[in-house]
C-alpha cells in the first residue's frame, strides 16, 4: 500500500550510536502517531543518520520475498528509508521507498468454452526471482524464478502480488492460472521483453481459454508511491 495502517510496525536505527540505537515503532490510527517503548537515543554528533525499514521483522539491507502471499501482501512490501536529522531539532522525518514491485492481475475475459459455473480461479501464481533482496535491488541466493501465490483481491476477478525487480524475456512463463479446481495450470507468457522495476506498480489483463491464458493488452505501469513519516522523535542523551 501507500499508507500505513493501524498496528503496522517499523524498525528505526540510529547509525551514530552503538547502543540504545534501535527501536520498533507501532502506528496508532486513532492518534495518527507512532509509539515505542524502546530506547532510541541521539548520538553526540550534531547530525545523526537514521535508517528505517518495514516490515519491522525484516532488515534494512536484505529481504526474503514470501512465496505465499494468499493472506495479503503487507508482509511482502519491503520498504526502507534513510535520513540525516539535526539533534537540536529533535525530530526525524522519514520517507519510505518501495524496494520491490507490485503486480495486479485482472481477469478481463472468459472464452466461451467455459460455462458460468466453471469460471472459477482456484489459484493464480506469478513468477518472481527468489532469494534475498539487497538494498540496491540485486538478488543473492539461488537467483531462480519461483512461483508466488497471489492474494485474491476480488474473487475470480482481481489478484495482487509483490515480486522482485527483474527482466523477463519475451515468451517467458510469467504466470500460471489454476481454473475450477484443475491441478494443471494454464501458462501465461509475456508478449514482449518486460523489465520490472522497484517502486513501480504493474497491471495485467488476462483472457482465460481452455488450453491457455493470454495477456490481452499492453502492461500498464505506474508509480507505486512513497510513504512519509514526519516528526518522529528520538530521545536526547
Mark where each language-model region is.
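Short, small/hydrophobic-biased targeting/export segments
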Residues: 173-175
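Edge beta-strands of extracellular beta-sandwich domains
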Residues: 61-67, 183-192
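Short, surface-exposed alpha-helix to beta-strand junction/turn motifs within ectodomains of secreted
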Residues: 120-138
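Short beta-strand elements
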Residues: 76-82, 187-210
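Short, low-hydrophobicity acidic/polar segments
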Residues: 1-120, 125, 146-167, 179, ...
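Surface-exposed loop/edge segments in extracytoplasmic proteins
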Residues: 16-24, 132-137, 142-146, 182-189
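Intrinsically disordered, low-complexity repeat and linker tracts
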Residues: 207-237
Amino acid at each position: 500500500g501507500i499508507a500505513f495502517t493501524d498496528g503496522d510496525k517499523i524498525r528505526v536505527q540510529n547509525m551514530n550510536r552503538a547502543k540504545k540505537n534501535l527501536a520498533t515503532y507501532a502506528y496508532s490510527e486513532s492518534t495518527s502517531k507512532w509509539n515505542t517503548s524502546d530506547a532510541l537515543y541521539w548520538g553526540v554528533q550534531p547530525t545523526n543518520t537514521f535508517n528505517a525499514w518495514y516490515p519491522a521483522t525484516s532488515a534494512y539491507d536484505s529481504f526474503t520475498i514470501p512465496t505465499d502471499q494468499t493472506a495479503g501482501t503487507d508482509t511482502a512490501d519491503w520498504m526502507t528509508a534513510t535520513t540525516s536529522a539535526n539533534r537540536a531539532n529533535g525530530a526525524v522525518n522519514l520517507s519510505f521507498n518501495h524496494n520491490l514491485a507490485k503486480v495486479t492481475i485482472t481477469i478481463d475475459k472468459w472464452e466461451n468454452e467455459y460455462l458460468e459455473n466453471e469460471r472459477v480461479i482456484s489459484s493464480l501464481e506469478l513468477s518472481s526471482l527468489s532469494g534475498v533482496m539487497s538494498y540496491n535491488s540485486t538478488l543473492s541466493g539461488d537467483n531462480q524464478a519461483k512461483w508466488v501465490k497471489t492474494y485474491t483481491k476480488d474473487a475470480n476477478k482481481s489478484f495482487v502480488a509483490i515480486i522482485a525487480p527483474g527482466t523477463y524475456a519475451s515468451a517467458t512463463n510469467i504466470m500460471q492460472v489454476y481454473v475450477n479446481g484443475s491441478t494443471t495450470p494454464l501458462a501465461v507468457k509475456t508478449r514482449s521483453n518486460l523489465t520490472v522495476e522497484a517502486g513501480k506498480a504493474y497491471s495485467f489483463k488476462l483472457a482465460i481459454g481452455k488450453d491457455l491464458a493470454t495477456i490481452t493488452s499492453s502492461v500498464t505501469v505506474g508509480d507505486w508511491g512513497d510513504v512519509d513519516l514526519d516528526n518522529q522523535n528520538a530521545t536526547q542523551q
